[in-house]
């Protein structure tokens, strides 16, 4: 739950679809008098688990998630920037063929983002022993990869 500039709240919660086995992330925006302003569901047919969540400006929020890809039967890191009215400003997927998960996210001094998570694609490449994974992006969520 995050306090908004107008004195309201933005609340993130998990939605479980018991019949389909997928999870979604729900967002509920409450105004200063605790009235519902809007709700949004992110996920749908692909399972998603929200992790890191924080306010990054007066009217924008950033969330790190792990997004399940049914076609690959694995997770990817998923980063979403959300406006105060519930609109998705941008979203980015990071990862490869095996499980890659985003755990936490912070805004960096240059306006970009640092994401911490785990990977089975990079590092030792062992599917059963994930490595720490750090991603640095610019303010629009773009990143570059460097080989060893």
Residue ranges and their predicted role:
Residues 1-148:
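A sequence-level/structural motif corresponding to short, flexible coil/turn segments enriched
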């Amino acid at each position: 739950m995050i306090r908004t500039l107008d004195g309201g709240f933005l609340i993130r919660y998990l939605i479980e679809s018991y019949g389909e086995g997928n999870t979604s992330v729900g967002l509920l925006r409450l105004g200063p008098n605790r009235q519902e302003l809007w709700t949004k569901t992110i996920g749908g047919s692909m399972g998603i688990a929200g992790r890191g969540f924080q306010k990054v400006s007066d009217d924008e929020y950033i969330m790190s998630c792990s997004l399940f890809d049914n076609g690959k039967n694995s997770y990817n890191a998923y980063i979403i920037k959300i406006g105060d009215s519930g609109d998705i400003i941008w979203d980015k997927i990071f990862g490869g063929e095996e499980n890659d998960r985003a755990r936490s996210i912070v805004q960096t001094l240059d306006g970009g983002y640092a994401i911490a998570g785990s990977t089975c694609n990079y590092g030792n490449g062992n599917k059963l022993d994930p490595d720490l994974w750090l991603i640095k992006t610019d303010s629009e969520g773009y990143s570059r990869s460097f080989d060893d």
